[in-house]
Amino acid sequence: MGTLSVNQNKLQKRLRRLAGEAITDYNMIEDGDKVMVCLSGGKDSYTMLDVLLHLQKVAPIKFEIVAVNMDQKQPGFPEHVLPAYLKELGVEYHIVEKDTYSVVKELVPEGKTTCSLCSRLRRGTLYTFADEIGATKMALGHHRDDIVETFFLNMFFNGALKGMPPKLRADDGRNVVIRPLAYCSEKDIQAYSDMKEFPIIPCNLCGSQENLQRQVVKDMLVEWERKHPGRTESIFRALQNVAPSQLADRNLFDFTSLKIDENATPRFLDVLNI
């Protein structure tokens, strides 16, 4: 790729800045960390690797990057693409081979979405591998829009106010997951991926499943953003500004003990002079 245009340069700087802010805000990467960057071959994970490699050069701390891709034995998976790309970059990498494709096809009825089971199997395998190579952080390519979509999916279909945190300690206690692109929009990532011409690998297992609940939520957010620009960013900021006393979760706030404070100063409203 040649010299960047003004807009391309702004895009690159914006993604790097936002990723750097997210990493700093949530203390995602610390001095001496070994970061396992999970690559799927999609636009998000390629962008994440690209940004992290830059930050590795300019950050005031030292950390390792190890790229990992999981070959799930999907028919037609181009095994040569990622190794060739990573060798050209000079990045240490591992290809983890695990036939989760056959498991998913066997357990999920025809016509049903495979994403949930596929993701659980993949996550478990990657957690184990991260432990094996001594990775202290596991970086995933989820972005701001993914986080907002997950929030609505949980609210609409699971009756829970929870999303996809920028940083998470796994249930096993042995893995810390980070999402460096948590502040980045999908629109910017798509534009950056197009600009860099990353060798995208399509998902043959679930890429054609258009009637997913996530796609419905995504379409809803796209329409909201079209009518009210900035709404997705506003929703994301709301996830960073939670007021437990203004919700209804008794585990987060002790509503049962609320009583009048006899020592509080009364606030009188002079209704006659309104």
UniProtKB/Swiss-Prot annotation:
Protein location: Cytoplasm
E.C. number: 2.8.1.-
Motif placement: PP-loop motif: 40-45
Cofactor: record remark: Binds 1 [4Fe-4S] cluster per subunit. The cluster is chelated by three Cys residues, the fourth Fe has a free coordination site that may bind a sulfur atom transferred from the persulfide of IscS.
Catalytic EC class: transferase
Pathway: tRNA modification
NCBIfam families, per database record: PRK10696.1
Protein name: tRNA-cytidine(32) 2-sulfurtransferase
Phylogenetic classification of the source organism: Bacteria, Pseudomonadati, Pseudomonadota, Gammaproteobacteria, Pseudomonadales
